[in-house]
Amino acid sequence: MSQSVSERTRIKSDRYESGVIPYAKMGYWDAAYTVKDTDVLALFRITPQPGVDPVEAAAAVAGESSTATWTVVWTDLLTACERYRAKAYRVDPVPSATDQYFAFIAYECDLFEEASLSNLTASIIGNVFGFKAISALRLEDMRIPHSYLKTFQGPATGIVVERERLNKYGTPLLGATVKPKLGLSGKNYGRVVYEGLKGGLDFLKDDENINSQPFMRWRERFLNCLEGINRASAATGEVKGSYLNITAATMEEVYKRAEYAKMIGSVIVMIDLVMGYTAIQSIAYWARENDMLLHLHRAGNSTYARQKNHGINFRVICKWMRMSGVDHIHAGTVVGKLEGDPLMIKGFYDILRLTELEVNLPFGIFFEMDWASLRRCMPVASGGIHCGQMHQLIHYLGDDVVLQFGGGTIGHPDGIQAGATANRVALEAMVLARNEGLDYFNQQVGPQILRDAAKTCGPLQTALDLWKDISFNYTSTDTADFAETATANR
């Protein structure tokens, strides 16, 4: 007697039985799995719902971020399902947390389209964050294999070429954000750019939300900025620039503004993270083809990066943006007004600047990773910093960084040019002291170096007097799980 259709399609297998079975039994958990060099690895912080086994929660994340759905489907048998299933292979309790677990998951590289951050993220963070079996989920780190990294462009210009273009070595770069960020006319905006560059800064920049508003259209801003840049460059003999924000409603408009910036002589353009991954990669390709630096403002990142138990750790965003092709990205200051644990910030900077990563748990780096010759990305420190913190900034952040003093330049009592000069003199004094072997980070030595430099620089003395008591000494909400490192200005 012939079998019925349902009988013929019911496969007797541990991993295939019609209906709903646990993810761990479907093949999404494999404690004996051997990680391959070509695997994409992801580390998730999982908070299971009460009563949900952590291993099953990890398997559910692996399944829902790769091939699974809520029930077994017979079409799995038409694929290489054993290969394409993501494998949760390790679950560890999070230190000092009673209900959180680190879940390590491996993905076959063929699950992702080459050179497509949008496709990668559609799987890794696309649907699984709303899964009912978990009450919170955070993507903490990823390892992108060499073979997959090679399909990405990486930074359009990179640190080495940027320094060659600026002819500036062995010191951080100096910048400032034009303030107020909204409301200035084009003429006054250009004046701020000129004064800051003339006073000693390398860059001025637009802020994240200045695009093309009724009080100042983008062409007006671009033209006045370039006039200020050219005048300051002629006066100082240095290569100068201003980050022109080309973020817009459509990619057609983004390209139009980028082409115009190039035509009038700009060396750098700027975009916002809120543009989206496809837009960021698209303009990064344009920047590489047109020999333009590309600055990224991380606008919007704290909506998903700041909370410790849910969202995406910023270190992952750093990896994605380096892959996408930006040259600059805001990555924290340690001592400024924005969130920033010292060790976590150092981890972000290492991800952007090193060619190879080693496991460093206090820095929050969970995977070894070779960057496959992708160029290095310049971190930007911005938000509530001033020249009185120069010894701390150099100690924590090193040389390959843009130090952006917005209020710390434009808020100077003697004017914008004086504020820029104060920052330039403070930086050069501290770099010289460091190069001479002085213990500049010492709380007595560092401030004294600045006071000595201020004896021959009135603007620096004024700045030190004005901001000497200003600090943002708060405990970070996001700290490393393997070290106690509350943010402190010391």
Swiss-Prot record:
GO terms for cellular component: chloroplast. The active site is at residues 179, 297. It is an enzyme of class 4 (lyase). The modification N6-carboxylysine is found at residue 205. Keywords: Calvin cycle, Carbon dioxide fixation, Chloroplast, Lyase, Magnesium, Metal-binding, Monooxygenase, Oxidoreductase, Photorespiration, Photosynthesis, Plastid. It catalyses: 2 (2R)-3-phosphoglycerate + 2 H(+) = D-ribulose 1,5-bisphosphate + CO2 + H2O; D-ribulose 1,5-bisphosphate + O2 = 2-phosphoglycolate + (2R)-3-phosphoglycerate + 2 H(+). Gene3D superfamilies: Ribulose bisphosphate carboxylase, large subunit, C-terminal domain, RuBisCO large subunit, N-terminal domain. CDD domains: RuBisCO_large_I (cd08212). Its EC number is 4.1.1.39. One of its GO terms (biological process) is reductive pentose-phosphate cycle. Mg(2+) binds at residues 205, 207-208. It is found in: Plastid, Chloroplast. Binds 1 Mg(2+) ion per subunit. Its cofactor is Mg(2+). NCBIfam families: PRK04208.1. The basic functional RuBisCO is composed of a large chain homodimer in a 'head-to-tail' conformation. In form I RuBisCO this homodimer is arranged in a barrel-like tetramer with the small subunits forming a tetrameric 'cap' on each end of the 'barrel'. Heterohexadecamer of 8 large chains and 8 small chains. RuBisCO catalyzes two reactions: the carboxylation of D-ribulose 1,5-bisphosphate, the primary event in carbon dioxide fixation, as well as the oxidative fragmentation of the pentose substrate in the photorespiration process. Both reactions occur simultaneously and in competition at the same active site. Belongs to the RuBisCO large chain family. Type I subfamily. This is Ribulose bisphosphate carboxylase large chain. The gene is rbcL.
